[in-house]
């Protein structure tokens, strides 16, 4: 079980934490941003996207690049399907997690695994636009002409043991997530970029089925 948790953390975590973000300035009207972000998120029922993940391990000089497909559907359903350079599948469906690595399959309940519960909540909050309401983080918001950057610094004990910071970049046109970045305590650095996004696309429930 511990090995599976570490594998998922490696797949969806990373970034280097910076006191400032080049090209960004603090949002002057945070209340307005919260309102617009929440309103746009309410209209987003589903997301279909490709993704590119780049992971920099502190012990290696070269980055590891992975590609795959991503689906999100309210409420609380996420599917990440890695197809290059390896095959890997992760499904988050409410309080259940399914992981398939080659021929190995694992089903985990977030109710019985606090670490997976935290990972699950982070992913869902990012997609549903509720990250600013998560009391487990201290939040700051920055912006440039085209995007807004939400910085999440963990204050809850469990999360502080996993991450230094998480940043979520959203497109100002529709407030959809364009990238998620995280910094592990180990210094490993990862960014997941979402491309070819389709909002409110037809996403079958069967994609999130955990048998």
Enumerate the predicted regions with their spans.
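N-terminal leader/targeting segments and the immediate start of mature chains
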Residues: 18-52, 56-61, 206-211
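N-terminal, post-signal-peptide region of Sec/Tat-exported proteins
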Residues: 47-78, 83
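Short hydrophobic/aromatic-rich beta-strand segments that constitute the beta-sheet cores
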Residues: 51, 78-82, 97-100, 150-152, ...
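Flexible, surface-exposed loop/linker segments and immediately adjacent secondary-structure boundaries
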Residues: 108-147
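Sec-dependent N-terminal signal peptides
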Residues: 4-13
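Gly/Pro-enriched, hydrophobic low-complexity segments
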Residues: 21, 132-211
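An acidic-aromatic
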Residues: 69-117
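Short beta-strands and strand-coil junctions in structured, solvent-facing domains, enriched
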Residues: 58-59, 79, 86-89, 106, ...
């Amino acid at each position: 079980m511990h090995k599976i948790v570490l594998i998922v953390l490696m797949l969806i975590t990373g970034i280097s934490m910076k006191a400032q973000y080049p090209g960004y300035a603090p949002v002057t009207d945070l209340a307005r941003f919260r309102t617009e972000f929440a309103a746009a998120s309410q209209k987003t029922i589903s997301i279909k996207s490709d993704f590119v993940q780049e992971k920099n391990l502190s012990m290696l000089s070269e980055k590891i690049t992975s590609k795959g497909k991503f689906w999100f559907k309210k409420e609380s359903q996420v599917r990440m399907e890695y197809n290059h350079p390896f095959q890997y599948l992760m499904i988050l469906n409410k309080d259940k997690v399914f992981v398939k690595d080659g021929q190995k399959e694992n089903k985990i309940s977030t109710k019985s695994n606090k670490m997976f519960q935290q990972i699950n909540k982070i992913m869902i909050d990012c997609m549903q636009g509720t990250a600013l309401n998560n009391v487990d983080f201290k939040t700051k918001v920055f912006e440039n002409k085209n995007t807004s950057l939400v910085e999440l610094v963990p204050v809850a004990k469990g999360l502080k043991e996993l991450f230094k910071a998480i940043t979520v970049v959203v497109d100002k046109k529709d407030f959809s997530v364009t990238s998620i970045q995280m910094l592990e305590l180990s210094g490993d650095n990862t960014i997941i970029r979402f491309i070819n996004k389709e909002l409110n696309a037809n996403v079958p429930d069967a994609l999130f089925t955990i048998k």
